[in-house]
Amino acid sequence: MKLFANIATVATRLLPPATGEGRDGGDASCEVPPIPTFPRKRGKGLFRAAFAFAALFIALICLRALPQAPLASQSQYSSAVYAADGTLLRLTTAPDQQYRLWTPYVLIAPKVAEAVLQYEDRWYWWHPGVNPAALIRSAKATFSGERRQGGSTISMQLARKIYDIDSRSIVGKLQQIAAAFWLEARYSKRDILEAYLNFAPYGGNIEGVGAASLVYFQKRAADLTLPEALTLAVIPQNPAARGGARAGTPALNEARSRMAAIWLDRHPQDEPIGARHAPAMKSAAALPFRAPHLANQLLREGRGEIFASIEPKMQATLERTIARRIERERNSGIRNASAILIDSQTMQVKALVGSANFHDQDIDGQVNGVLARRSPGSTLKPFIYALAFDQGVLHPMTVLKDAPTAFGPFSPENFDGRFIGPITAQDALTRSRNVPAVQVATRLTRPN
């Protein structure tokens, strides 16, 4: 007990007086500070804010987890037909007459996406759909009369496109911002970037990297070179001045030079990509129209990107062969022909010519002669005689009768309207006589 009493005495001496007086009766040199307390209302406000933030976070997670319609479903698309080696045979327009070919993100050269982000929205992966600093900069430049600066992010540009928003007014800009937040809440960054690359304007009636690469460079987006990728990266910012019929103008060259400087700042090892290395660009008028009959057939059966089995060199050879034969036999009245070349091992079509001239209406050139229905006629006769030989019904020197004969209600005639009497099987086949052929057919038994 004495021990606890001594401890209490020591503790009493160490603690300052509760009355505020010192041990000697003077004013205390220090006071024990009161325990801080928060106002009741402030505590409730913090709780409510935390609850609202948590609820918003959970709502965003649930919204992202819900199944969403693919962004690709926002439009209709072109179709592209390629040969076996990837050569473009045909690029069609979409139902709205736009060249727009949906190309998955993984089939777009990575340098294209990187260049687009460096030029259009370098903070894309970090902002929530809107870049406040860029918007403030753009607004300041607009109201101060300076050169206008773009403040729209990739997400905002995509929202304007797919929701058809007029962002030139303040109300429209607010709608665009809200739509960008809505997109970011529902789709991943990669989904949004993929959709932007497929909907970005490239001048005239060209939309998206997939269609632009085929029109301007006649190659798929996966095969673009660095200069070509940098070219496509700068067109969407001002498609009227840099794309379409104006491709290759000073406006495009200037923008491409700026883009090259930005790129080289991060990738100095990629030199040279200056103005003298600018890629040659084509127009939509130069799009190929190869193997038209085959392309038409494939387009009736499918859409999107279609890969044919034909070989361009074989196709060109077959087309030349048909053209030469028609020219050689023109005096004989032959004006049209069709042919198909099939690999006997794989049964793949390697070349197909449906007519002598697809654009010649006098010969119904757009009709695919390879698929046209026709009577087999005399083409069956060799098979009839061959089967008769196999079954022992006759041999080449067997004498047959070429005379008026009725086979039930059917009385065949010959192409020349005449009958020549007794004839060997060999001569009957060589001279394509109809009555002997039908006579042989009646002797055949059904093959096992």
Where are these regions (language model features)?
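Short pre-catalytic segments that frame enzyme active sites
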Residues: 87-101, 211, 241-244, 298-301, ...
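Non-catalytic, structured segments within soluble enzyme domains
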Residues: 60, 147, 151-316, 413, ...
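Active/ligand-binding-proximal structured segments within catalytic/core domains
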Residues: 107-139, 364-386
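Terminal hydrophobic membrane-targeting helix
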Residues: 65-113
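N-terminal type II signal-anchor transmembrane helix
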Residues: 2-14, 45-84, 123
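Active-site-adjacent helix/loop patches that line small-molecule binding or acyl-intermediate pockets
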Residues: 154, 162-163, 169, 173, ...
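Acidic helix-start/capping segments at beta-turn-to-alpha-helix junctions
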Residues: 110-111, 127-145, 271-289, 310-313, ...
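Glycine-biased, low-complexity coil/linker segments
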Residues: 20-22, 43
